[in-house]
C-alpha cells in the first residue's frame, strides 16, 4: 500500500515537473505581442512590405546607440575618412547575422534564448543566462549614460537625476505595449529619423570633401599596417554586432501573424522581414558613416580631447575647433540626437532583457515587475558609479568603455548557437542556411571572436 502511494506520488511529481517544463518551453516569445500584427493576404509588394516594416527599426537602434558614437567620431577625427570601409564591412556582417536571427524566429516560432536553453543542460542554461544578462547590463550602461548626459546638457539636470529619469522610462514602455507593438515601432522609427536628420544636417553644413569621403569606403592596407588605426578599426567592428540584438531580432520577427504550416507563407515572412531588416540597417550604416564623416570634417587635425560626449557638445559650439559654423544650435542638436539614441535604445534594451529572462530561466512574473527588474539590474552599476564619483561625467563615461568588454565576452555565446541552429536541417527544414551562407557566417564568427579576444587582451593590458 505504501509502495503504491509512493509510486503514485512519484508519478504526480514527474507529471508536475513535465507540465512546468512544458509550460516554460512552449510559451511564446514576448507572448503579449507575439503574432499581434496582422498581415494582409494577397496584397501588393509595397503594402505587404509596409505591414512587415517595424521590427528592423528596433534592431537597427542597437547599431547606433550612444556606445558607438565616440568610436565613430574618434575614427574620423584621427584618420579622416579611411575607416568608412570598416563601417561598411561591419554593416554587411550585421545584415547577415540579423537576417539569420529573424529567419530562426519565424521558422521555429521560438527565439534564440528559448532554443539555446532547450538544447543545453540546466547548469549551462543558467551560465549562459548570466553571461547574456551581463551583456544586457553592459548595453544598457551606454543608453543610460547617454540619456543622462543628454538631459544634463539640454536641461541642466544633475547627472544622477538624469539617470533616475531614464530608469522611469520603463513605465512609458509598459503604456506603449498596451497601445500595441506597432506604436512602439513607430516611436522608435521616429527617434531614429531624428538622429539621422540631425547628423545629416550637421554633416551638410560641415562641407566634407565628397571625393575623399567616397574613397574612404574602399579598404586600404594602412588599416592593417598602422597599429593604432587597426585597434580603432577593431573597436568599430567589435562594437557593431551586439549579442542582445540577435536575441531581439529572433523574437520580434514573430510579431507578425504567420501560419507556420504553410511553407509559402513562412517564406514570404522571411523575405519581407529580411528586406525590412536590411533597409533599417542601411539607415544605421548611414548614421554611423555620418558620425565618422562629422568627426573627419570638423575635428581632423584639431588638438584636444574629443573622447567624451561633453567634449563633443562643447566643441560644436566652439569656433576655435569647428570654425565659423560653430553655434549653440549645433550643440543642442547633438544633445537632442544623443537623447533620442538613448531613449530608443532603452526601449529595445528592456525588451531584450525580457526575452532573455523568459527564454533562459523561464521566469514568469507580472509584466511591470519583469520590466522594472530588468531596468534596475542595468541601472544599478551606473547609479552606483554616479553616486560614488559625485556625478563626474568623465569617470562615469569610463564605465561606458568598460562595458564594451562585457559585450565582447558575451558575443560568441550568441553567435555560435545562432549559426548552429540556422544550419540545422532538422530544426530549420528547407529554410536552413545555404552552403555559402553557412561558411560565410562561420568565417565571420571566428574572425569576430578573434578580434574581440584581441580587444579584451589589450583592454586588460596583456597585449600591447
From Swiss-Prot:
The chain crosses the membrane at residues 50-70, 82-102, 125-145, 157-177, 186-206, 229-249, 281-301, 321-341, 376-396, 399-419, 443-463. Signal peptide: none annotated. Residues 1-20 have a biased composition (Basic and acidic residues). Keywords: Cell membrane, Ion transport, Membrane, Symport, Transmembrane, Transmembrane helix, Transport. GO terms for biological process: iron ion transmembrane transport. Residues 1-28 are annotated as: Disordered. NCBIfam families: nramp, Nramp_1, PRK00701.1. This is Divalent metal cation transporter MntH. The lineage of its organism: Bacteria, Bacillati, Bacillota, Bacilli, Lactobacillales. The gene is mntH.
Amino acid at each position: 500500500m505504501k509502495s503504491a502511494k509512493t509510486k503514485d506520488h512519484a508519478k504526480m511529481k514527474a507529471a508536475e515537473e513535465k507540465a512546468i517544463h512544458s509550460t516554460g518551453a512552449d510559451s511564446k516569445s514576448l507572448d503579449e505581442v507575439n503574432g499581434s500584427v496582422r498581415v494582409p493576404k494577397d496584397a501588393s509588394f509595397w503594402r505587404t512590405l509596409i505591414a512587415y516594416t517595424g521590427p528592423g527599426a528596433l534592431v537597427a537602434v542597437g547599431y547606433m546607440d550612444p556606445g558607438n558614437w565616440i568610436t565613430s567620431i574618434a575614427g574620423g577625427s584621427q584618420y579622416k575618412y579611411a575607416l568608412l570601409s570598416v563601417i561598411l564591412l561591419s554593416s554587411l556582417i550585421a545584415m547577415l547575422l540579423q537576417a539569420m536571427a529573424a529567419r530562426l524566429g519565424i521558422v521555429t516560432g521560438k527565439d534564440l534564448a528559448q532554443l539555446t536553453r532547450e538544447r543545453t543542460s540546466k547548469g549551462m542554461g543558467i551560465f549562459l543566462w548570466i553571461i547574456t544578462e551581463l551583456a544586457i547590463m553592459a548595453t544598457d550602461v551606454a543608453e543610460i549614460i547617454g540619456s543622462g548626459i543628454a538631459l544634463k546638457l539640454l536641461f541642466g539636470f544633475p547627472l544622477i537625476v538624469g539617470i533616475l529619469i531614464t530608469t522611469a522610462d520603463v513605465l512609458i514602455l509598459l503604456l506603449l505595449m498596451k497601445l500595441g507593438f506597432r506604436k512602439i515601432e513607430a516611436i522608435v522609427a521616429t527617434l531614429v529619423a531624428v538622429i539621422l536628420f540631425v547628423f545629416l544636417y550637421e554633416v551638410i553644413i560641415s562641407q566634407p570633401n565628397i571625393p575623399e569621403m567616397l574613397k574612404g569606403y574602399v579598404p586600404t592596407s594602412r588599416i592593417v599596417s598602422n597599429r593604432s588605426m587597426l585597434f580603432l578599426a577593431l573597436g568599430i567592428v567589435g562594437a557593431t554586432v551586439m549579442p542582445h540584438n540577435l536575441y531581439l531580432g529572433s523574437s520580434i520577427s514573430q510579431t507578425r501573424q504567420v501560419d507556420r504550416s504553410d511553407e509559402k507563407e513562412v517564406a514570404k515572412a522571411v523575405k519581407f522581414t529580411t528586406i525590412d531588416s536590411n533597409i533599417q540597417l542601411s539607415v544605421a550604416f548611414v548614421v554611423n558613416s555620418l558620425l565618422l564623416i562629422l568627426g573627419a570634417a570638423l575635428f581632423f587635425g584639431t588638438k584636444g580631447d574629443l573622447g567624451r560626449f561633453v567634449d563633443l557638445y562643447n566643441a560644436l559650439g566652439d569656433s576655435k575647433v569647428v570654425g565659423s559654423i560653430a553655434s549653440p544650435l549645433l550643440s543642442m542638436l547633438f544633445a537632442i540626437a544623443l537623447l533620442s539614441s538613448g531613449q530608443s535604445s532603452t526601449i529595445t534594451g528592456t525588451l531584450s532583457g525580457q526575452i532573455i529572462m523568459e527564454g533562459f530561466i523561464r521566469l514568469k512574473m507580472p509584466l511591470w515587475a519583469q520590466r522594472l527588474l530588468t531596468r534596475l539590474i542595468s541601472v544599478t552599476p551606473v547609479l552606483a558609479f554616479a553616486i560614488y564619483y559625485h556625478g563626474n561625467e568623465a569617470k562615469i563615461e569610463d564605465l561606458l568603455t568598460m562595458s564594451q568588454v562585457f559585450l565582447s565576452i558575451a558575443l560568441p555565446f550568441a553567435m555560435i548557437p545562432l549559426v548552429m541552429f540556422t544550419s540545422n536541417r532538422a530544426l530549420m527544414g528547407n529554410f536552413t542556411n545555404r552552403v555559402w551562407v553557412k561558411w560565410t557566417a562561420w568565417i565571420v564568427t571566428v574572425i569576430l571572436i578573434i578580434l574581440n579576444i584581441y580587444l579584451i587582451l589589450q583592454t586588460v593590458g596583456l597585449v600591447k
